[in-house]
Amino acid sequence: MIYQSPTIQVELLEDNIAKLCFNAPGSVNKFDRETLASLDAALDSIKQDSNIKALVLTSSKDTFIVGADITEFLGLFAQDDAVLLSWVEQANAVFNKLEDLPFPTASAIKGFALGGGCETILATDFRIADTTAKIGLPETKLGIIPGFGGTVRLPRVIGADNALEWITTGKDQRAEDALKVGAVDSVVAPQALEAAAIQMLKDAVAEKLDWQARRNRKLSALTLPKLEAMMSFTTAKGMVFAVAGKHYPAPMAAVSVIEQASTKGRAEALQIEHQAFIKLAKTDVAKALIGIFLNDQFVKGKAKKAGKLAKEVNNAAVLGAGIMGGGIAYQSASKGTPIVMKDIAQPALDLGLNEAAKLLSAQVARGRSTPEKMAKVLNNITPSLDYAAIKHSDVVVEAVVEHPKIKAQVLAEVEGYVSEDAIIASNTSTISINLLAKSMKKPERFCGMHFFNPVHKMPLVEVIRGEHSSEETIASVVAYASKMGKTPIVVNDCPGFFVNRVLFPYFAGFNGLLAEGGDFAAIDKVMEKQFGWPMGPAYLLDVVGLDTGHHAQAVMAEGFPDRMGKSGTDAIDVMFENKRLGQKNGKGFYVYSVDSRGKPKKDVDPTSYGLLKDAFGELKAFEADDIIARTMIPMIIETVRCLEEGIVASPAEADMGLVYGLGFPPFRGGVFRYLDTMGVANFVALADKYAHLGGLYQVTDAMRTLAANNGSYYQA
């Protein structure tokens, strides 16, 4: 053994080829500080052994290296620039040491080689992947750029255009695609991987392959004619900005770094990367996006833990077909859990099956599935008009019409057809789980399971704990949601649960602006372009449906009359009473049609303005800051109330619920990250300016205390 540490082992193989194996404790290899220090020490040991003629890098895991240890990032990025620069330079010195070894090097890549893992393989002369490999630099998704030489080496290996696409999108690349652009030299079967890498090194040692020429190319400036370079980078800037926009600076910074470094050798090029990396690491956007990544890991970790208490779900059922039932059936079946789709009407079953078939056909058309897989998934969906079909179901999801009496009747019926230990969940967005539980003989095996529409696109599922729901029930539904590919958050029962409870105060702020003559299209523009929502409040209400919004608003008003009760008519009432239901009937705040390419199109409709003018008078302009404050303050305070009341368990789960359930702008990180970034005291001062607008603008006592103590919701 040449070198051994808890994360890396180096041994000498036949023909004096050294093998460096990444073997960290745990299921995957990460590039944390310990691994980086071990790699540095291992390379020193390798350099001192004069017998070594070549080096192969391998992994003992199913993956090569999944990337840096992101849990270290927020603490590290909070350090002074000088400390951060020192860390980046030390890390890069290790990668340079690997690249500068006096003999050929190769990486044998299986599974993921992402971020720092990808930058490791780029520092070797040859890269051999097996068919399971996925390679990429996802750093721009975290609001930063590669910091271990990725922006320098990748363009010199695969060309500027390809590197720009890889880095600015942050997408993983399959082994075959990596081979096409020259990121890897060969793709082999998993069992042949190490032998293929070693053979390539033998050929290099025997001078059949020119490893030094390959290395020199990475150490030099990019060989790109001036005009071609100018066109390439100008085009990239336009395309990247069109996708990333002004709120996500990292992709544009990556283009700029690659352009500036293109005429430099390695040392100068790395310095350009370092400076840009440090600048981005200090941004609020990086903190927000890294926070989302960590919150996602936290929520998934809780779901994994819940799996230990969960009843195994091998068969499921959904009651109520149609679009929602079909979406749930598709999601369950496509992730491997057979499901019965039960309804009382054949046309509804047909609609549900057609919905599943449509979603599967779209997957096949995009090349993400095959007709054989589609057939297998459809065979996992059993339509039935008879309750007898659900008797072996481990979990039954009730998804009938959103009406308390109908749901209660169906829930009482279904209990008589399933096993004693079957779990029943209601897919409801507004009806109290405790109320519905009254119709159950065994309320302990009942909870809420709120899917968001469209089911196949929306990643969030709210699992609602009733006062009688058992831990096994909650754990089982959380585990089933995870198995379906969803991100579950557990919330306690209250009107609107978590997501709708915090959404409707936002709509109330919007209604307040319109009642004073606000222009709904102007408000949407501010909330989309400046705050960063995917849809402004008027557009979102049209998508949700004004009938749905009208009903949910009434539920919220009844549940929280002191804050959400309303006197008189508001804009939602105006649209609903005039049968303007939104996208579903082609007219709401906006009017909807189909363009010449068959794509849905929305336009401002003078009729909407006329109706609102009749109700609220002439239009009045509001400043952008005023629009943002009046819509967001109620949502933020209600989110804080949910945390304080224990409706949601943590800031992390609340923020994930907002990002995944409502499309809260990821670059802001969620309400609690937004509050920490703004400063709780600054938010309290802002909210107090609007306190005269009513109960939704009243800051809680606990918030005031936190503000007075200069506290924050996250510890990092």
Swiss-Prot record:
The keyword Transcription regulation does not apply. Pathway: Lipid metabolism; fatty acid beta-oxidation. Residues 1-189 are annotated as: Enoyl-CoA hydratase/isomerase. One of its GO terms (cellular component) is fatty acid beta-oxidation multienzyme complex. GO terms for molecular function: 3-hydroxybutyryl-CoA epimerase activity; delta(3)-delta(2)-enoyl-CoA isomerase activity; enoyl-CoA hydratase activity; long-chain-3-hydroxyacyl-CoA dehydrogenase activity; NAD+ binding. It catalyses: a (3S)-3-hydroxyacyl-CoA + NAD(+) = a 3-oxoacyl-CoA + NADH + H(+); a (3S)-3-hydroxyacyl-CoA = a (2E)-enoyl-CoA + H2O; a 4-saturated-(3S)-3-hydroxyacyl-CoA = a (3E)-enoyl-CoA + H2O; (3S)-3-hydroxybutanoyl-CoA = (3R)-3-hydroxybutanoyl-CoA. GO terms for biological process: fatty acid beta-oxidation. In the N-terminal section; belongs to the enoyl-CoA hydratase/isomerase family. Involved in the aerobic and anaerobic degradation of long-chain fatty acids via beta-oxidation cycle. Catalyzes the formation of 3-oxoacyl-CoA from enoyl-CoA via L-3-hydroxyacyl-CoA. It can also use D-3-hydroxyacyl-CoA and cis-3-enoyl-CoA as substrate. This is Fatty acid oxidation complex subunit alpha. It comes from Shewanella baltica (strain OS185). The gene is fadB.
